């Protein structure tokens, strides 16, 4: 009621509500900080350590998460990063928080004194104690694979002065005596090291260590004890049955070696009290559990890698394995390590050979008594890489593979089949030949290793005219029927025998596997006449289909990549190939020398081998230190050059060329008198800002043979193709952007009539460095 008794209604005319002010809501800004902490941890966990430090500097909350949560550091990636005085604190912090990669790299860095410079005084003792600490950390963090750190400290040990390997061994042993927990795997590693000595007393100590390790639950030690006691147990039926039960228990717990031994033991199932059906089921479970891993994924990760490049790399590794007489198992494991690494981490093409030879160094140490030493591995690459390069990539491989080196291979399943089924020796060799050919072709990886081994045996029996190539017994043992294996057999035959092998840039077919099985120990099985595709289809009872054309590129598309480390096996002819993309490759020069060049280079070849040796304890014997190293005559060549043939500075050369007679012919691995004439120096423009100092023990030389003659040189030039003797001195070398080279050569003396000289491999005197991409040539 208003004034004067007038009643006002609340209509729009009589009464007005105050207008509401509409406040515009600001949109909420969502940032990464708005995410829950659990989500932030998942984001931070898989970043590289450099990215983690960058994120840490963004906000105080992120700084708090990085500084106070161990999971961030435990999962940080240290890929392509090596311990140095500048980042040592980061590596140590990550290792203490549970980072496997950081612990492995620190252990290797201290063991080989690589990257973490320590004074020469008491170097081995100081580094050995530090290396043992981080190796112990790495082994405690290694939960998914067999103990592995023993492969780095296994003998041979240095006999002159203190040995870092021995210091690590003694330190780990002292740690096990003081520490009561988490030492089963360390004890196993110590036992593996002592078991490699010839001393009977040390072998007894190794047996005691295995017993203690097995008592604490180490499955690998339990199997080694079973293997050592097997001969004694087999003499008594009761003990034999008890031993078989233990083996079955180890196999059920996941020990791969025990599973293989159990399958092979089924050949004598009646002695073990097993029925034939039970034995077949046990073996069948092993074969059916085999899983295929498609290696074609490699090429989705490695954009610059082709199937032919991988083929050439594996072909070279086969030549090395043949030259060093390594087993097929060692070769298969090496290739598997290469492929697994290529699926996980990006590798530039010029490092493919380094990756391959490093995998072979690791695998020989893990499964063989005779090893490929680091210094010899460097020599096999013609010193294209330095000792330090190989040490570092070993750390990258172990980190990427998480310490898991031993995995099922085609060879394992083949050995089981040849144990269970009577097969003629020539058929066994043919089956082994086929299994080794499978390494070259990634397209065959769509089949599981067990299926490939079964198909190889079936194809071998078909080629040798067996009336029943696949019996009911084989069907029961493998679980694969005749029709199951037919597609795999056809693919195997097509890839191995129908398709042409790829050729290198010299138009030479890459046939290292074939040459490997031309040996008399394999009864020259690779020279046997092969069943034609039509005959195979008829034998299999399938309709013949026209095979697809070869998948390898034509010769014009193949880059210069690899050549043989064993020149005695094939005479490969050089030619002026026209190729591009030079900057992506590193070269291993292979050329013959004139007698003047031999006189100049003779002593330097052996001197450079000693200089790249690195760790003195990492050698096969004392004789190797004096130059007793197998010298390859032709190696990896990954340079791609695309030039006009008239302007190319490399003329044709071959093993058939005639050279002047030289009675004092130097051989790699033997000392030759130094040249009386002054040594011509290469033209090198190194980066003065680059830190090229490398650490190492007293036997490690951080400088190349050339840099020792010219103290003003810095940098590690990447080598290119070496000129053939006889190229014109006025010919200009080929240049690539961001790369400089200079070359002066003079024509050789005229050859004497009718005189032939053994070709000698030209030593690559320059060393490889990732940061420095300059090219250097010898001025002869």
Swiss-Prot record:
Protein name per the record: Cyclin-F
Domain annotation Cyclin N-terminal: ranges: 288-405
Listed InterPro entries: Cyclin, Cyclin-like_dom, Cyclin-like_sf, Cyclin_C-dom, Cyclin_N, Cyclins_cyclin-box, F-box-like_dom_sf, F-box_dom
GO cellular component terms listed in the entry, alphabetical order: centriole; cyclin-dependent protein kinase holoenzyme complex; cytoplasm; microtubule organizing center; nucleus; perinuclear region of cytoplasm; SCF ubiquitin ligase complex
Post-translational modification: Degraded when the spindle assembly checkpoint is activated during the G2-M transition. Degradation is not dependent on the proteasome or ubiquitin and depends on the C-terminal PEST sequence.
Source taxon at top rank: Eukaryota
Function of the molecule: Substrate recognition component of a SCF (SKP1-CUL1-F-box protein) E3 ubiquitin-protein ligase complex which mediates the ubiquitination and subsequent proteasomal degradation of target proteins. The SCF(CCNF) E3 ubiquitin-protein ligase complex is an integral component of the ubiquitin proteasome system (UPS) and links proteasome degradation to the cell cycle. Mediates the substrate recognition and the proteasomal degradation of various target proteins involved in the regulation of cell cycle progression and in the maintenance of genome stability.
Motif Nuclear localization signal 2: positions: 568-574
Domain topic, free-text comment: The nuclear localization signals mediate the localization to the nucleus and are required for CCNB1 localization to the nucleus. The D box motifs 1-4 (amino acid sequence RxxL) are involved in substrate binding, such as FZR1/CDH1, and may be ubiquitinated.
SMART domains: CYCLIN (SM00385), Cyclin_C (SM01332), FBOX (SM00256)
Subcellular location(s) per record: Nucleus; Cytoplasm, Perinuclear region; Cytoplasm, Cytoskeleton, Microtubule organizing center, Centrosome, Centriole
Residue span, F-box domain: 29-76
SUPFAM superfamilies, alphabetized: Cyclin-like, F-box domain
Subunit structure: Component of the SCF(CCNF) complex consisting of CUL1, RBX1, SKP1 and CCNF. Interacts with SKP1. Interacts with CUL1. Interacts with CCNB1; interaction is required for nuclear localization of CCNB1. Interacts with CCP110; this interaction leads to CCP110 ubiquitination and degradation via the proteasome pathway. Interacts (via the Cyclin N-terminal domain) with MYBL2/BMYB. Interacts with FZR1/CDH1 (via N-terminus). Interacts with RRM2 (via Cy motif and when phosphorylated at 'Thr-33'); the interaction occurs exclusively in G2 and early M.
D box 2 (motif): residue ranges: 343-346
Ranges where the record places region PEST: 582-761
Keywords: Cell cycle, Cell division, Cyclin, Cytoplasm, Cytoskeleton, Mitosis, Nucleus, Phosphoprotein, Ubl conjugation, Ubl conjugation pathway
Major localization class: nucleus
Organism lineage string: Eukaryota, Metazoa, Chordata, Craniata, Vertebrata
Motif segment (D box 3): 349-352
């Amino acid at each position: 009621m208003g004034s004067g008794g007038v009643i006002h209604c609340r209509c729009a005319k009589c009464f007005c509500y105050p207008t509401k002010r509409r406040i515009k809501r600001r949109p909420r800004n969502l940032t990464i900080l708005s995410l829950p902490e659990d989500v932030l941890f998942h984001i931070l966990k898989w970043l590289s350590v450099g990215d983690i430090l960058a994120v840490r500097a963004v906000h105080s909350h992120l700084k708090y998460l990085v500084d106070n949560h161990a999971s961030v550091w435990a999962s940080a990636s240290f890929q392509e990063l090596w311990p140095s005085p500048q980042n040592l604190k980061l590596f140590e912090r990550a290792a203490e928080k549970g980072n496997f990669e950081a612990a492995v790299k620190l252990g290797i860095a201290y063991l080989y004194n690589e990257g973490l410079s320590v004074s020469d005084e008491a170097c081995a003792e100081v580094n050995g104690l530090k290396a043992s600490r981080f190796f112990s950390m790495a082994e405690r963090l290694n939960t998914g694979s067999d103990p592995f750190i023993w492969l780095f400290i296994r003998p041979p040990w240095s006999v002159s002065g203190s040995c870092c390997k021995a210091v690590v061994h003694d330190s780990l042993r002292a740690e096990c005596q003081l520490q009561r927990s988490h030492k089963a795997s360390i004890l196993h590693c110590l036992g593996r090291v002592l078991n490699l000595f010839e001393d009977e007393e040390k072998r007894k100590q190794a047996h005691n260590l295995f017993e203690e390790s097995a008592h604490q639950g180490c499955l690998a030690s339990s199997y080694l004890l079973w293997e050592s006691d097997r001969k004694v147990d087999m003499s008594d039926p009761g003990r034999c049955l008890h031993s078989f039960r233990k083996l079955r228990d180890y196999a059920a717990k996941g020990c791969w070696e025990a599973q293989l031994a159990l399958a092979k033991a089924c050949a004598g199932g009646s002695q073990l009290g097993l029925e034939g059906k039970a034995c077949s089921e046990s073996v069948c479970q092993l074969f059916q559990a085999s899983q295929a891993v498609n290696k074609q994924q490699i090429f989705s990760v490695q954009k610059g890698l082709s199937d032919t490049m991988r083929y050439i790399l594996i072909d070279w590794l086969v030549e090395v394995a043949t030259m060093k007489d390594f087993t097929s198992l060692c070769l298969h494991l090496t290739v598997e390590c290469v492929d697994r690494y290529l699926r996980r981490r990006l590798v530039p093409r010029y490092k493919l050979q380094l990756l391959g030879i490093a995998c072979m160094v690791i695998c020989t140490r893990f499964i063989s008594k005779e090893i490929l030493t680091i210094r010899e591995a460097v020599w096999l690459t013609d010193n294209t890489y330095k000792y330090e390069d190989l040490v570092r990539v070993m750390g990258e491989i172990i980190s990427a593979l998480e310490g898991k080196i031993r995995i099922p291979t085609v060879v394992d399943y083949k050995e089981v089949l040849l144990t269970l089924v009577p097969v003629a020796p020539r058929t066994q060799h043919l089956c082994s030949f086929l299994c080794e050919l499978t390494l070259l072709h990634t397209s065959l990886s769509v089949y599981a290793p067990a299926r490939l081994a079964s198909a190889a045996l079936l194809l071998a029996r078909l080629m040798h005219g067996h009336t029943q190539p696949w019996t009911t017994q084989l069907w029961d043992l493998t679980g694969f029927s005749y029709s199951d294996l037919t597609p795999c057999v056809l693919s195997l035959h097509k890839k191995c025998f129908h398709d042409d092998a790829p050729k290198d840039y010299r138009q030479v077919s890459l046939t290292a596997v074939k040459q490997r099985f031309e040996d008399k120990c394999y009864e020259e099985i690779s020279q046997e006449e092969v069943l034609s595709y039509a005959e195979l289809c008829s034998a299999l009872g399938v309709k013949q289909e026209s095979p697809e054309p070869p998948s390898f590129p034509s010769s014009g598309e193949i880059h210069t990549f690899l050549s043989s480390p064993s020149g005695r096996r094939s005479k490969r002819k050089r030619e002026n190939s026209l190729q591009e993309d030079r900057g992506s490759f590193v070269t291993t020069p292979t050329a013959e020398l004139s007698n003047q060049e031999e006189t100049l280079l003779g002593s330097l070849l052996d001197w450079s081998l000693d200089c790249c040796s690195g760790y003195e304890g990492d050698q096969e014997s004392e004789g190797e230190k004096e130059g007793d190293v197998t010298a390859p005559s032709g190696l990896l060549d990954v340079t791609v050059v695309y030039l006009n043939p008239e302007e190319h500075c490399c003329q044709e050369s071959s093993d058939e060329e005639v050279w002047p007679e030289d009675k004092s012919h130097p051989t790699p691995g033997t000392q030759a008198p130094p040249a009386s004439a002054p040594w011509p120096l290469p033209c090198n423009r190194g980066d003065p800002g680059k830190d090229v100092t490398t650490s190492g023990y007293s036997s490690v030389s951080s400088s190349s043979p050339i840099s020792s003659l010219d103290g003003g040189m810095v940098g590690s030039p990447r080598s290119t193709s070496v000129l053939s003797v006889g190229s014109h001195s006025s010919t200009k070398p080929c240049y690539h952007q961001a790369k400089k080279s200079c070359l002066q050569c003079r024509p050789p003396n005229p050859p004497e009539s009718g005189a032939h000289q053994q070709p000698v491999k030209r030593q690559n005197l320059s060393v490889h460095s990732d940061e420095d991409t300059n090219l250097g040539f010898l001025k002869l």
